[in-house]
Amino acid sequence: NAKSIVREQVAPFLIRTEKREAIDNNGNLLFKNRITHLVTISWDDRNNLQRELYEMVSSYVAKTYNKALRNRKKNMCLIFLLIIMQRMVTSSTAAIRQSLERRLNVLLEQRTCVGNLREEDLDELNIEDGVEDAIEAISLDMELEIEELKQIISLAKQAQFQNQDAKVEPLLNEIDAILSEDRTQKVIIFTEFVATQTYLQELLVNRGYTVTILNGGMSIDERNAAMQEFKTSTSIFISTDAGGEGLNLQFANIIINYDLPWNPMKIEQRCGRVDRIGQQRDVHIYNFIVGETVENRVREVLEEKLSVILKEMGVDKYSDVLDSEVAECDFTDVYMRSIGHASQVEKNLYPVEAEMKQQLTNAQKYKDVIREEKDLAKLVGTESNFDVDSALRTMLT
């Protein structure tokens, strides 16, 4: 009886197959090669104010986050806002400045509210969907926050006028190299924020490129029109995560992750838009990261641990290891607790590492089960006395 089966009962027995091993009737691999390029960005004298902005925002976020955790349930909207701000400051100066200015206006107009965001919503909530409520989160100390925001906004304005963001030059260099080599290639740029999307669109159009954008605020008709435009007319497609959900973009083979999500599963979801059956070219993924950040340190340690697990499993995809139901909350907490405490990264990753190792153990134990033939009729009996737990355990013995 299928209705008797619930996720909690079958989760220990779920097996993620390694789809990159899939072959056609002739024994040919169905997936093309995936080549990942890490593009590490350094702040130099031209971007020293951007570095200062990162440090100031991170200090503000870390301090406020630790205070908000004292009453986590009441402060969930504020916690989400702080997460957004920390992500924005490494995305673009335009994005963080816009968000800070909106937050300041809310406080000055006293439009704050507690909000109804629950902790269990965090792993499902998309940034584009939740930012409006988060901006109006109740303040822990309104006068202090107003003063801090004014200082950060002032620095953001200076950084914005000092020079273009540090990530821009490497982005333009990569795109120039890719498209000068083969003008028929199509490039997809992923960002988490509409403000960054707009910023990049203006830069690339001014560079002479044809650009299509897609975000979660667009209607179905607008999304379809954007897809058709990119497929037939333009070279570059800039999408937010919300805009890119469910898209099949296998006619493109270049992805640039201008913003790296904290959750590796989200990176896999992006790559899956082009890295799928039917892709005719090798897939190239360019991951942009600012080197002198806590985010990069977390990424380094996390990838070290993941590489060990992936090697032991003989797979090369995060999605074959991580449980998407828990990954977002776990990784978000790791990053937020590490902001301002870089020396604690290893310690903060212990729970995540334990979860991954447990999934590895399960995968190794049950990997061959799907290749075995089982007589289900003998195992489950009749519908009236169907015992899910015992049936599954019998299958796995």
Mark where each language-model region is:
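SF2 helicase/translocase ATPase core recognition
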Residues: 1, 23-61, 240-326, 330
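C-terminal accessory region of SF2 helicases/translocases
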Residues: 281-397
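Helical mechanochemical/support elements of P-loop NTPase systems and associated helical scaffolds
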Residues: 2, 6, 49-53, 57, ...
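Conserved Helicase C-terminal RecA-like lobe
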Residues: 29-46, 71-75, 84-90, 94-235, ...
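Short amphipathic alpha-helical segments and their helix-coil junctions
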Residues: 53-77
